[in-house]
Design a protein with these regions (language model features):
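Hydrophobic scaffolds flanking metal-cofactor catalytic centers in soluble metalloenzymes
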Residues: 1-91, 98-128
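Short flanking/linker segments adjacent to small metal-binding domains or redox-active Cys/His motifs
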Residues: 60-72, 129-155
């Protein structure tokens, strides 16, 4: 059985979020440059520096900090997550109502969402996760193609 920790209910893959694949190395680079310049020594004299330094350290961590399935990532009001949990659906692509209005609204911004859902249904979740891992290696992130505005339903 697949480890769904990196798969959102709506069918996005967490590893393709810039919070996971782009921000950490850039934050580490900034952290290293600031360390080299001695910011740790004289920065604390600047109001807000300690909070900033702590935040930067968190961004630099490559450990996943959130999970849609735990309710700690994405909008807290997400109606897609709520619906999937109520229906006992692991991923919306496997729901009889897919794609529903909620998914269609989100797909306005995440233009690969519907094709990814169809692919997931065709090859199964395990094979789909493997494909997403390969996609991660290309440097792709959803932010590269995300269109605004899009809808995250609250119901």
């Amino acid at each position: 059985m697949a480890d769904l920790a990196q798969v959102t209910y709506c069918g996005l893959y967490c590893g393709l979020c810039s919070q996971r694949n782009r921000i950490p190395p850039r934050a580490r680079a900034l952290q290293e440059a600031m360390h080299k310049d001695g910011w740790e020594l004289w920065g604390p004299g600047i109001p807000g520096f300690e909070a900033f330094w702590s935040f930067l350290g968190g961004l630099a961590s490559s450990e996943p900090r959130c999970s849609c399935r735990e309710g700690r990532c994405g909008p807290p009001f997400c109606g897609i997550r709520k619906c999937a949990q109520e229906k006992g659906i692991e991923v919306c692509a496997f729901c009889d109502d897919y794609p529903c209005e909620r998914i269609l609204g989100l797909a306005k911004g995440y233009v690969t969402l519907l094709a990814d859902g169809q692919r997931m249904r065709a090859i199964g979740i395990d094979a789909w996760i493997q494909e997403q891992e390969e996609r991660c290696k290309t440097g792709f992130a959803y932010v590269d193609i995300r269109c605004e505005p899009y809808e995250v339903p609250d119901k």
